[in-house]
From Swiss-Prot:
It holds the Pfam family DnaA_N. GO terms for molecular function: ATP binding; ATP hydrolysis activity; DNA replication origin binding; lipid binding. Residues 84-125 are annotated as: Domain II. This is Chromosomal replication initiator protein DnaA. GO terms for biological process: DNA replication initiation; regulation of DNA replication. Residues 126-342 are annotated as: Domain III, AAA+ region. InterPro entries: AAA+_ATPase, Chromosome_initiator_DnaA, Chromosome_initiator_DnaA-like, Chromosome_initiator_DnaA_CS, DnaA_C, DnaA_dom, DnaA_N_dom, DnaA_N_sf. The gene is dnaA.
Length: 462
């Protein structure tokens, strides 16, 4: 009875949560009765803690509404319920559609550019062993992506298939792909895990056509245990490659073999890619990887400095992190330059030294991102007048973009809250603070706001 009640609760949660939240946190749960207690099994500690912190009140409220004082107690545990290996499924709305093709699987390897038989799993896979979950710096900007990647590594071909990670350049998507691959190979050393850039897939297909080896190409790619393709947007306008990948995708999913894809944009926004592919990209879980927030940027710098054997003062790390915001690659490149200059000159790493070592980079960053530039960009994005940013109008169509612009100004510039308020028509600093908190809340609750904010950061940081 209580397990049936949980199925009803799943329906309620599916209605109330975003598709990403539901797929990420609710779909992996398994339920089983233990006396008068309903036990919910989570795949790992991260999911367990998140569900218990965020959704336990909603779940208990639903149980009470349905059964009153007879509502079951609720307990959380990690693992799979003993009586069945599969989770209780959600309603048909989230079930993957029937695949259009199911080519026969084969263990034959593709011959073009094939590795030597004695090659190791890492060499055969192109998986970089240096990219691990342990050295991936986690923050709010990439927390969901890392959690999803961890679950895929533990259970490839399971709930999140395909996993689609998207976001700007240098944010850690490739690191997560390799970390998943290393996790799978660690658990199953003989697993055939293949990582590649999308252009390599295209090149392999072209070579196969030239060498009359297209059947070997098909058998090779459709026989892997896990296929990770980076920058899938480069399939745009390559019709034959899209056709081959379409059938490869179908074959792998039918065999419950894991697929992970990355892109610089949301699947539906990828121009030049067929709708049937874009639709399939969203069958599993789609997660945004956003530019790292200040605390994460500092942590990245401190980790990188530690790996390089350098003692980086906290104030220097904060100085760099506050001024370079676009991506991890830029941060690491700046730190490498600072370290190289320090080693060459023998000078200690201070804020003044960093100002000198990065003067051209810092000058460019300050020139590109100004409050005025943010206001103009946001006004254009939301199709409102620039004057509305400074006006007293409170209609939602104007107030929300203004709040977004204030939040971006706090994140992307070094201006204080009073200075930002002055730039928005002489508003008080408390108004700016309220706007920042409101937008932070909406980014957690609203997929549209999260997307808008990420798009604007990419535009302003490019």
């Amino acid at each position: 009875m209580a397990v049936s009640l949980w199925q009803q609760c799943i329906g309620r949660l599916q209605d109330e949560l975003s598709a990403q939240q539901f797929s990420m946190w609710i779909r992996p749960l398994q339920a089983e009765m233990d006396g008068d207690t309903l036990v919910l099994y989570a795949p790992n500690r991260f999911v367990l803690d998140w569900v218990r912190d965020k959704y336990i009140n909603i779940i208990n409220q639903f149980f009470t509404e349905q059964m009153g004082s007879d509502a079951p107690k609720l307990r959380f545990d990690i693992g799979s319920r003993p009586s069945a290996p599969k989770p209780i499924q959600a309603t048909a709305a989230v079930v993957k559609p029937k695949l259009e093709s199911s080519p026969q699987k084969s263990q034959t390897s593709f011959n073009v550019n094939a590795p030597e038989p004695a090659a190791t799993a890492n060499h055969r896979s192109n998986i970089n062993p240096t990219y691990q979950f342990e050295n991936f710096v986690e923050g709010k900007s990439n927390q969901l992506g890392k959690a999803a990647a961890l679950q895929v590594a533990e259970n490839p071909g399971g709930a999140y298939n395909p996993l689609f990670l998207y976001g700007g350049t240098g944010l850690g998507k490739t690191h997560l792909l390799h970390a998943v691959g290393n996790g799978i190979i660690k658990n199953k050393p003989n697993a055939k895990v293949v990582y590649m850039h999308s252009e390599r897939f295209v090149q392999d297909m072209v070579k196969a056509l030239q060498n009359n080896a297209i059947e070997e190409f098909k058998r090779y790619y459709r026989s892997v245990d896990a296929l990770f393709i980076d920058d899938i947007q480069f399939f745009a306008n390559k019709d034959r490659s899209q056709e081959e990948f379409f059938h490869t995708f179908n074959a792998l999913l039918e065999g419950n073999h894991q697929i992970i894809l990355t892109s610089d944009r949301y699947p539906k926004e990828i121009d030049g890619v067929e709708d049937r592919l874009k639709s399939r990209f969203g069958w599993g879980l789609t997660v945004a990887i956003e530019p790292p927030e200040l605390e994460t940027r500092v942590a990245i710098l401190m980790r990188k400095a530690q790996e390089s054997g350098i003692n980086l003062p906290d104030e220097v790390a904060f100085f760099i992190a506050k001024r370079l915001r676009s991506n991890v690659r830029e941060l690491e490149g700046a730190l490498n330059r600072v370290i190289a200059n320090a080693n060459f000159t023998g000078r200690p790493i201070t804020i003044d030294f960093v100002r000198e070592a990065l003067r051209d980079l810092l000058a460019l960053q300050e020139k590109l991102v100004t409050i005025d530039n943010i206001q103009k960009t946001v006004a254009e994005y939301y199709k409102i007048k620039m004057a509305d940013m400074l006006s007293k109008r409170r209609s939602r169509s104007v107030a929300r973009p203004r709040q977004v612009a204030m939040a971006l100004s706090k994140e992307l510039t070094n201006h204080s809250l009073p200075e930002i308020g002055d730039a928005f028509g002489g508003r008080d600093h408390t108004t700016v603070l309220h706007a920042c908190r409101k937008i932070a809340q909406l980014r957690e609750e609203s997929h549209d706001t999260k997307e808008d904010y990420a798009n604007l950061i990419r535009t302003l940081s490019s």
